[in-house]
Curated annotation (Swiss-Prot):
Note: Plants overexpressing VUP3 exhibit severe dwarfism.
The organism of origin for this protein: Arabidopsis thaliana
GO BP annotation list: multidimensional cell growth; xylem development
Region Disordered, residue ranges: 45-81
Domain of life: Eukaryota
Protein's name in the database: Vascular-related unknown protein 3
Taxonomic lineage: Eukaryota, Viridiplantae, Streptophyta, Embryophyta, Tracheophyta
Amino acid sequence: MENSALSNCVRRTNFSNQQRTMQEGLEESSWTMYFETEDGLGHYDDSSMMSDAASPMGCVEEDTASSPSNRTEGYSGMEDNTIEEKTMNNGKIEEKILNKNGIKIEEYCAELKKRGLCLVPLSMLSNYIG
């Protein structure tokens, strides 16, 4: 009797495993059919399917407010927020490089040297210490 109960339990387990496998197979095939139909349609040029990045670009007009041709003559902005000013005195061109506070950089460096401070590359300092 125990054998029949055990075999009955095994049969139910096998049947439920087969049924689960069949259900998984049906789910997989339904997804496969879905993808095959989408691939078969082949109309990807629909506006809802095309992103802005994939759309063709028209002519890009230059922004005249930020174009380099509209900068004030005599001044040019540099990367580290300094301004380079070119002036003409007695036929001689002088260049002053000012930081954003209006202090000449040469004078600032001279003041540091007077105080005994100088700029040293970090690698040179690490080689000296290490």
